[in-house]
């Protein structure tokens, strides 16, 4: 592997790491109320000083999945945590995560395979 290939590989890993760190901070900011909405992937790319295509291609090459996949999974992880460890209603959690409650339930069920209410009930057992 030549030096240019090594540098490209190193840069790809750096972009991927920066993306995941940004997602963690951004999702935390939304949950805490410091930010009132989730950014789109093109907006995240802009914040990372990348084109949308470069970010998408890099994440897909490094991980095998589209950046949206990880964005959604990280939101689902936060939702699961809130459902398991808080007394907030499903509607409150949905609104905290900037979702309409009915859309949130569909989104959650798509990834988890059960409704937020059922997940909460089973996680308390």
Give the location of each predicted region:
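Basic, amphipathic alpha-helix used for nucleic-acid engagement in HTH/winged-helix/SANT-Myb modules
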Residues: 1-12, 56
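A short, Lys/Arg-enriched amphipathic alpha-helix from helix-turn-helix/homeodomain DNA-binding modules
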Residues: 10-48, 69-87
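Basic/polar phosphate-binding segments, predominantly the helix-turn-helix DNA-binding elements
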Residues: 42-70, 94-118
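Terminal helix-turn-helix DNA-binding modules in bacterial transcription factors
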Residues: 62-99, 122-125
